[in-house]
Amino acid sequence: MRVLLVGGGGREHAIGEALVRGGAELYVVSKHKNPGLARLARGYGLAKETDIKKVLEYAEKFGVELAFIGPEAPLEKGIVDALEENGIPAVGPSREAAKLETDKAFARTFMERNEIPGRKVFRVFTDVSKMRSWVDDFGRPVVVKPIGLTGGKGVKVVGYQLRDNEEAKSYAEELIRRDGRVLIEERTNGVEFTFQVFTDGKRVLPMPLAQDYPHAYENDEGPITGGMGSYSCSNGLLPFVTREDYEKALETLKATVEAMRKEGTPYKGILYGQFMLSKGGPVLIEYNARFGDPEAINVLPLLETSLLEVAEGIVDGNLQGAEFEKKATVVKYLAPKGYPTNPVRGVKVEVNEKAVEEVGARLYYASIDENFTLLGSRAIAVVGIADSLEEAERIAKSVIPHVKGELFYRRDVGTRKSVEKRIELMKEFGKEFEPNPC
């Protein structure tokens, strides 16, 4: 089957590889030519992923029968609706359903209206004085969020990016003046984790949990990035997530899909819940309407079921099953020096792919072009897969000497020490549990 993949990052390289492994004939449209995808694809179109007209032209030219949407920006523009109107079924939510990610105020009011478990106290404001008096009355630390897509970089939390609620009010005022409205939520203390599922609008199939490292530098310091790496465990859980917590988080995602269906906006594709595990259980921080990047790179190499079959099940409303190999994974992203604030661009990197293969690791290309020139964002994801976390981390780390260029990475991603730190943090927040093996 001819499948069009929209997007050209590390996440999309992992999707493309899984589609080809599952029997698809792959065609790609993205704004730059990803060297990994270029080898897998029968045809490659260069266009902005949000240029719906151009994407449709390529879809027609390649004669594709199915599309798979990688990033969130084209979903917001209604790419799935446009493809389906032109007779091409697509893996991804409609523009309206994608509002779970693209409109944070929509997502929170939807959860409230449908009594979805894992809700937070929130308010949406358009008026500066009302916002200021509510924050004063609330009296507890808050989180300030822009309403739309921010690439994970516009959210600010009191005690982290914001000193106190006074600073939160100033930032919220800035957003109201810029965007016309702002979302303010209670701050939840805990440890974050990623829960991704496949859904056809009715059935929900879970993937292994993952945890990412959003800060640029070691020990969770520095600016927030798209994610400097992530890990997953062989049992599909995480050391600090109990089976009960897992079931509660899954119930949040199932209830979401069911409520979307009942409201007449069926959600199909990948739904990704970013959860905060608090003392009282999992709380939904935000929805994402697509795979995580890097978290897609943890789970897709483990998928034993054909991704093409899963994709067909999603668009046909007949999702059957998704089996994953029981292995631990560690993904480390190599990013240009200076990322994310002032990244090096236009410089070439050298990759010894043969040596990478010999150490048993995998590589996924991201913000790098066909000439191996850095484009300014996270460039290459290296992945270790093994029975234990330690071995997976060792494999991922052993790739680093075989990639030469003006790059940096977080050495602590997926290390036992960093995972133990998260377990300790959870205990400090008053959660009583016996850590799962990883």
From Swiss-Prot:
<comment type="similarity">
    <text>Belongs to the GARS family.</text>
</comment>
<feature type="binding site">
    <location>
        <begin position="135"/>
        <end position="194"/>
    </location>
    <ligand>
        <name>ATP</name>
    </ligand>
</feature>
<dbReference type="Pfam" id="PF02843">
    <property type="entry name" value="GARS_C"/>
</dbReference>
<keyword id="KW-0460">Magnesium</keyword>
<feature type="binding site">
    <location>
        <position position="286"/>
    </location>
    <ligand>
        <name>Mn(2+) 1</name>
    </ligand>
</feature>
<dbReference type="InterPro" id="IPR020559">
    <property type="entry name" value="PRibGlycinamide_synth_CS"/>
</dbReference>
<dbReference type="InterPro" id="IPR011054">
    <property type="entry name" value="Rudment_hybrid_motif"/>
</dbReference>
<feature type="binding site">
    <location>
        <position position="286"/>
    </location>
    <ligand>
        <name>Mg(2+) 2</name>
    </ligand>
</feature>
<dbReference type="Pfam" id="PF02844">
    <property type="entry name" value="GARS_N"/>
</dbReference>
<dbReference type="GO" id="GO:0046872">
    <property type="term" value="F:metal ion binding"/>
</dbReference>
<dbReference type="InterPro" id="IPR020562">
    <property type="entry name" value="PRibGlycinamide_synth_N"/>
</dbReference>
<dbReference type="GO" id="GO:0009113">
    <property type="term" value="P:purine nucleobase biosynthetic process"/>
</dbReference>
<dbReference type="InterPro" id="IPR011761">
    <property type="entry name" value="ATP-grasp"/>
</dbReference>
<dbReference type="InterPro" id="IPR037123">
    <property type="entry name" value="PRibGlycinamide_synth_C_sf"/>
</dbReference>
<feature type="binding site">
    <location>
        <position position="274"/>
    </location>
    <ligand>
        <name>Mn(2+) 1</name>
    </ligand>
</feature>
<comment type="pathway">
    <text>Purine metabolism; IMP biosynthesis via de novo pathway; N(1)-(5-phospho-D-ribosyl)glycinamide from 5-phospho-alpha-D-ribose 1-diphosphate: step 2/2.</text>
</comment>
<feature type="binding site">
    <location>
        <position position="288"/>
    </location>
    <ligand>
        <name>Mg(2+) 2</name>
    </ligand>
</feature>
<dbReference type="InterPro" id="IPR000115">
    <property type="entry name" value="PRibGlycinamide_synth"/>
</dbReference>
<feature type="binding site">
    <location>
        <position position="286"/>
    </location>
    <ligand>
        <name>Mn(2+) 2</name>
    </ligand>
</feature>
<keyword id="KW-0464">Manganese</keyword>
<dbReference type="GO" id="GO:0006189">
    <property type="term" value="P:'de novo' IMP biosynthetic process"/>
</dbReference>
<dbReference type="GO" id="GO:0005524">
    <property type="term" value="F:ATP binding"/>
</dbReference>
<protein>
    <recommendedName>
        <fullName>Phosphoribosylamine--glycine ligase</fullName>
        <ecNumber>6.3.4.13</ecNumber>
    </recommendedName>
</protein>
<dbReference type="GO" id="GO:0004637">
    <property type="term" value="F:phosphoribosylamine-glycine ligase activity"/>
</dbReference>
<keyword id="KW-0436">Ligase</keyword>
<dbReference type="InterPro" id="IPR013815">
    <property type="entry name" value="ATP_grasp_subdomain_1"/>
</dbReference>
<keyword id="KW-0067">ATP-binding</keyword>
<keyword id="KW-0658">Purine biosynthesis</keyword>
<feature type="binding site">
    <location>
        <position position="274"/>
    </location>
    <ligand>
        <name>Mg(2+) 1</name>
    </ligand>
</feature>
<dbReference type="InterPro" id="IPR020560">
    <property type="entry name" value="PRibGlycinamide_synth_C-dom"/>
</dbReference>
<feature type="domain" description="ATP-grasp">
    <location>
        <begin position="108"/>
        <end position="316"/>
    </location>
</feature>
<dbReference type="Pfam" id="PF01071">
    <property type="entry name" value="GARS_A"/>
</dbReference>
<feature type="binding site">
    <location>
        <position position="286"/>
    </location>
    <ligand>
        <name>Mg(2+) 1</name>
    </ligand>
</feature>
<dbReference type="InterPro" id="IPR020561">
    <property type="entry name" value="PRibGlycinamid_synth_ATP-grasp"/>
</dbReference>
<feature type="binding site">
    <location>
        <position position="288"/>
    </location>
    <ligand>
        <name>Mn(2+) 2</name>
    </ligand>
</feature>
<dbReference type="InterPro" id="IPR016185">
    <property type="entry name" value="PreATP-grasp_dom_sf"/>
</dbReference>
<keyword id="KW-0547">Nucleotide-binding</keyword>
<keyword id="KW-0479">Metal-binding</keyword>
